[in-house]
């Protein structure tokens, strides 16, 4: 009767390609390993600070951005912090924080803050990977490029309110016009 079957009898594929695929899917891919591969591919300067943390320097149009990504297994979150130096005079802090509020209202993912003690403008974002999800290289690459693009977009607005005599609303109009002008 076996000869009458239109196809050979099924056999377990556990030892073949299926086992390899299952092994790959079950394997823990560390998000920082993915980031390191991206940094190497893009030829960015980077330093693997720890098993769960990496720091990079990424060139933008306006300046070089320091980007740090850290993985928290406990929180199941890949946290990205993109920073650049900014030393506003004390009397400009109010208008800077007003600009931060205006800008953050425009940001759909991530948010800016200013770290006064370190004199750093910070754009941060947390990628939640709960339930054992694994971040893809595309997700992480997009996370980094979005951080740089967002920082580049609003950099002129920060400069106008901190070092010029522009209001937060005026500076935002310049940032919006700049974005549309390049589109």
What is each residue range found by the language model?
Residues 84-89, 127-135:
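A generic structural motif
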Residues 121-125:
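Short, aliphatic-rich beta-strand segments
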Residues 23-38, 42-45:
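Negatively charged, low-complexity tracts enriched in Asp/Glu with abundant Ser/Thr
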Residues 37, 41-65, 69-80, 85:
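Ser/Thr-rich, low-complexity intrinsically disordered terminal regions
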Residues 159-183:
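Short, highly charged C-terminal tails/helix-capping segments
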Residues 115, 127, 133, 140-152, ...:
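Long, contiguous binding/interaction regions
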Residues 83-120:
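Short, internal acidic amphipathic alpha-helical interface segments
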Residues 1-17:
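Short, Lys/Arg-enriched N-terminal segments with co-localized hydrophobic residues
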